[in-house]
Amino acid sequence: MAIVLGIDPGSRVTGYGVIRQQGRQLTYLGSGCIRTVVDDMPTRLKLIYAGVTEIITQFQPDFFAIEQVFMAKNPDSALKLGQARGAAIVAAVNLNLPVSEYAARQVKQTVVGTGAAEKSQVQHMVRSLLKLPANPQADAADALAIAITHCHLSQNTLRLGNDQMTLSRGRIR
């Protein structure tokens, strides 16, 4: 059994989702958003760090999964996203959580079946996979999808002694 915290980072809204994995069964534990309503970037980063720390303390996850930075058309947006990711990652590392990173296309491919999925498709599949009564809000759904991706991909990882091997298309890499 493992508890996984997924994070969808953002400088204004950071989504989080927490699930429990027991074998192939996934159970929803919680989700939501950390909203930073101030304009001052250092204060936003402090709020993200504090929010993620609080979530980790509340749910006691075993694993921390976060979306990788993608290259946006606006370099300023990419830098702010990177800073938000950094604040969340530092919170996890300070509490000794192992950090895994996943590309947005990889998350969509894992959860929906296509890397070009729309946000509404991700929300629908997260609702279906976790048997939720309604679609979660978009940022929380993305965070839950990141946690689901971590669970799915960790099932395809074999640990042999100190070596780690990953199954890819039926082959060990």
UniProtKB/Swiss-Prot annotation:
Binding site for Mg(2+) 2: E67
Enzyme Commission no: 3.1.21.10
GO biological process: DNA recombination; DNA repair
Location of the protein in the cell: Cytoplasm
Residues that, per the record, bind Mg(2+) 1: D8, D139
Alphabetized UniProt keyword annotations: Cytoplasm, DNA damage, DNA recombination, DNA repair, DNA-binding, Endonuclease, Hydrolase, Magnesium, Metal-binding, Nuclease
Subunit structure of this chain's protein: Homodimer which binds Holliday junction (HJ) DNA. The HJ becomes 2-fold symmetrical on binding to RuvC with unstacked arms; it has a different conformation from HJ DNA in complex with RuvA. In the full resolvosome a probable DNA-RuvA(4)-RuvB(12)-RuvC(2) complex forms which resolves the HJ.
Protein name from the UniProt record: Crossover junction endodeoxyribonuclease RuvC
Provenance organism: Yersinia pestis
